[in-house]
Amino acid sequence: MQTVLSLETSCDESAAALVKFNEGKFEILANSIASQANEHAKWGGVVPEIASRRHLESLPFLIQEVFSQSGINFSDVNAIAATVAPGLSGALLVGSVTARTLSCLHDLPFLGIHHLEGHLCSALLSENPPVPPYLVLLVSGGHTELIQVDRNFTYKRVGRSHDDAAGEAFDKVARLLGLSYPGGPAIEKFAKKGDPASFHFPKGRVSKPEGGFYPYDFSFSGLKTAVLRKVESIRSEGKQIPLANLAASFENVVSEVLVERSVKYAFDHGLHSLVMVGGVAANTCLRKMMVSKAEDKAIDVYMAPKAFCTDNAAMIGTAALVRLISGTSPSSLELGVSARFELDQSDLLYKSEPPF
């Protein structure tokens, strides 16, 4: 049995958790989040300086809260983990410095965790977790990627967005429609009242230099522009903007693109399991469509529990436990943070000479 205290401060969610691995299962002893969404909403997006300050204010209380909720103390903890990349540098530093300080104070190993690895491991918190090999659709505000996970939990990116992430597209379209931030929940709320067949928007593709298209990659900037032009056209005619129908049509085409390319890769490469993680994976339309289309190809779908799709510390703790179970060495206490760092480089976070 191993227990990890984990911290997540990569963007605008301050989070702490205590996660245990016992008899082959991951168990969340306590999980606490302080969201800054309302504070950033008035700016239409995350303000890095505000995010860092709120992490500083919230984290001590969150750590105290998870120990109080769980009924354990530091003597029961085997390691301390924190997100170190990618994300907002100032925000990452708050969690990393806090974790390394606690590691020194309590003489516990420290593990620096890649944020995307945390998302990948969030599916392991479900009642029926997937077993590698499988394909992961990681779809969030900052990332839209297809990642193949092999039997020994090695990661290979096999598809990506070449411009906006899907979640970023949701935020931008919500803003131009005059809806609230974050855009994903706002658009989903209006889409439930609309007709997804009302407007036909393009499914962006990425061209190859030699001709043709990358079959498993994504592009959402053209879709965002198409929605903008449609809104401008409707306004020029003096008509009322049909928010529900626009939201439903946009949500539907994003879901179709994500589902079609994910299922195609899994089918083409003989993978029988497909996993969805990340904030956008909480979208009901996307979840239903993925299950339906994957079933047609005899592909099983696994999803992170909705509560763990958005940023949280439980997924970071789970990723740390996976590392510990596999025999990965702790990170150096000299490991810093990085705003950008590729997932396939994540093994470098555990070298005696850290990458940053």
Swiss-Prot record:
The keyword tRNA processing applies. One of its GO terms (cellular component) is cytoplasm. Substrate binds at residues 138-142, 171, 184, 283. The keyword Acyltransferase applies. GO terms for molecular function: iron ion binding; N(6)-L-threonylcarbamoyladenine synthase activity. Its EC number is 2.3.1.234. Signal peptide: none annotated. It is found in: Cytoplasm. Its main location: cytoplasm. Binds 1 Fe(2+) ion per subunit. Belongs to the KAE1 / TsaD family. Required for the formation of a threonylcarbamoyl group on adenosine at position 37 (t(6)A37) in tRNAs that read codons beginning with adenine. Is involved in the transfer of the threonylcarbamoyl moiety of threonylcarbamoyl-AMP (TC-AMP) to the N6 group of A37, together with TsaE and TsaB. TsaD likely plays a direct catalytic role in this reaction. This is tRNA N6-adenosine threonylcarbamoyltransferase. It comes from Prochlorococcus marinus (strain SARG / CCMP1375 / SS120). The gene is tsaD.
